[in-house]
Amino acid sequence: MSFLIDSSIMVTSQVLFFGFGWLFFMRKLFKDYEVRQYVVQVIFSVTFAFSCTMFELIIFEILGVLNSSSRYFHWKLNLCVILLILVFMVPFYIGYFVVSNIRLLHRQKLLFACVLWLTFMYFFWKLGDPFPILSPKHGILSIEQLISRVGVIGVTLMALLSGFGAVNCPYTYMSYFLRNVTDADILALERRLLQTMDMIISKKKRIAVAHRTMFQRGEVHNKPTGFWGMIKSVTTSVAGSENLSLIQQEVDALEELSRQLFLETADLHATKERIEYSKTFQGKYFNFLGYFFSIYCVWKIFMATINIVFDRVGKTDPVTRGIEITVNYLGIQFDVKFWSQHISFILVGIIIVTSIRGLLITLTKFFYAISSSKSSNVIVLLLAQIMGMYFVSSVLLIRMSMPLEYRTIITEVLGELQFNFYHRWFDVIFLVSALSSILFLYLAHKQAPEKHMAL
């Protein structure tokens, strides 16, 4: 009876997560597009529901909600379904919609979709060869074979996003990195943009007048007769077409310049708004957060370097370890086990909420940046694939933030994976991503004033 009650709780929560994913799809991703494939919407919502359910089970594990055997069953079921979606269903439909957009392959789209899926499976399987991610005990058809490969891709994605976010967050929030932009700078750039637009209009008028003149001459005058008349008409038309092509090239160059000027003007307006915002109370608060995240970024890079150099992976969760160090240093009586459980629960909850929120914001921005009416279905499926892999790998990494007694079922469900490898791999990719982001933002910040002065 308790199993039925536990299952009804899980099904209800999954329905709620599915509904939230459906609303997010309708309200955020596809609100500007008329063409909607319901199979894409269902796949995205199901992926979102089962991804969130994994985080829900982590919280249930810490709080002791549901029976232990029920949690184990739903962990196993949830993991099997999410792997089925990520490895078989989503890649196949991505290939199917890619082929559907190619007219030459339209008649045999099912066949070519299968070919693309088999190609994906080949490279997906070969991905596990260079990495020490499995125990030798696992067979070729075991669930660990799939989790291990999905984990490598997901951890790589998480580390890339975390490395960039750790650097970009203080860069975005801190007023120290803002350029000094005045109204005179904006007016000067807008004046140059208007001058460029005037030049484009005048040159397009010249082209239009020339075309009209050539058309009228062809209408009014009879075709030239005689040998010399034909030579004269050919040379005149060639010279005229060359002049028009030169003017058109100038127009193309000016239009490209106008696009750059427009983007630069928008950037200056945004910077000016950020300067004004930084003077408000909320802006000062985010500026303080920027300094805090700067310290956190330096600390994370330092710890990642230490972990890589000394091949170190923590055996104790960070909260328990931090409390033990503080208690020993201060020499006070403190129930480390009791409080570490509660603080770990709060920490894991914050990680889960911020992970879901941050990923959804990133997915929305990414979708708007590259989608179109033809590619939107493929992009949504790619986002579903990224989201699922991201959440599976989050479970692999969050496991280390939990006290040992809460890791048991998660470890049993995930199997005998080489968990230390994933943490070491995360540190390597995080370090590369963070250092690359620092270099990129430094060059962009240094180049921006020079570009502004040149304009």
Swiss-Prot record:
The entry's keywords: Glycoprotein, Golgi apparatus, Ion channel, Ion transport, Membrane, Protein transport, Transmembrane, Transmembrane helix, Transport, Voltage-gated channel
Catalytic activity: iodide(out) = iodide(in); chloride(in) = chloride(out); bromide(in) = bromide(out); fluoride(in) = fluoride(out)
Source organism, top-level taxon: Eukaryota
InterPro entries, alphabetized: ABA_GPCR_dom, Golgi_pH-regulator_cons_dom, GPHR/GTG
Biological process, per Gene Ontology: intracellular pH reduction; protein transport; skin development; T cell differentiation
Subunit relationships: Homotrimer.
PANTHER family: G-PROTEIN COUPLED RECEPTOR 89-RELATED, GOLGI PH REGULATOR A-RELATED
Name of this chain's protein: Golgi pH regulator
Species of origin: Gallus gallus
Gene (UniProt): GPR89
